UniProtKB/Swiss-Prot annotation:
Top-rank taxon: Eukaryota
Documented effect of changing Y100A: Abolishes the interaction with host target PINP1 and lowers the size of lesions in leaves after infection
Source organism: Phytophthora sojae (strain P6497) (Soybean stem and root rot agent)
Region (WY domain): 50-106
Function noted in UniProt: Secreted effector that possesses RNA silencing suppression activity by inhibiting the biogenesis of small RNAs in the host plant to promote enhanced susceptibility of host to the pathogen during infection. Interferes with secondary siRNA production by associating with host nuclear protein PINP1 that acts as a regulator of the accumulation of both microRNAs and endogenous small interfering RNAs.
Subcellular localization: Secreted; Host nucleus
Protein name: RxLR effector protein PSR1
Locus of motif Bipartite nuclear localization signal (NLS): 56-69
Keywords (A to Z) from UniProt: Host nucleus, Secreted, Signal, Virulence
UniProt subunit comment: Interacts with host PINP1.
Region (Disordered): 29-65
Residues spanning the signal sequence: 1-20
Record keyword Transit peptide present: no
GO cellular component, one term: extracellular region
Length: 106
């Protein structure tokens, strides 16, 4: 009777050890796939660099301003949406926002 228990334990151990490699390989493949997905998620939120230096440069350099307006438009930023980013108590920022509105209407 002890021999049957020893054989049963040996067969069970063999079966368990053979199946143990498959789930770990599948888990690794899933984790790599999820890492690739996380990299793509960064593109969801597009940000504009609203540093004061760049905004002032936009006021003085028309070529730079038009390039930035094109980027804002391609990123989906609306005229009304800019009030969340620009300090509208500053008259030059109001002027810049109005320039963007005029550019959008062209």
């Amino acid at each position: 009777m002890r021999l049957t228990y020893v054989l049963l334990v040996a067969v069970t151990t063999l079966l368990v050890s053979c199946d143990a490699t498959k789930p770990s390989t599948e888990a690794t493949a899933v984790s790599k796939r999820l890492l690739r997905f996380v990299e793509a998620a960064d593109e969801e939120e597009r940000r504009i660099d609203f540093s004061p230096e760049k905004l002032r440069k936009m006021l003085g350099d028309e070529t730079y301003r038009l390039k930035k307006f094109g980027k804002w438009d391609s990123d989906g930023h609306t005229f009304d949406g800019l009030k969340h980013y620009l300090l509208l108590s500053d008259s030059s920022m109001v002027k810049l926002r109005n320039m963007y509105k005029a550019w959008l209407e062209q």
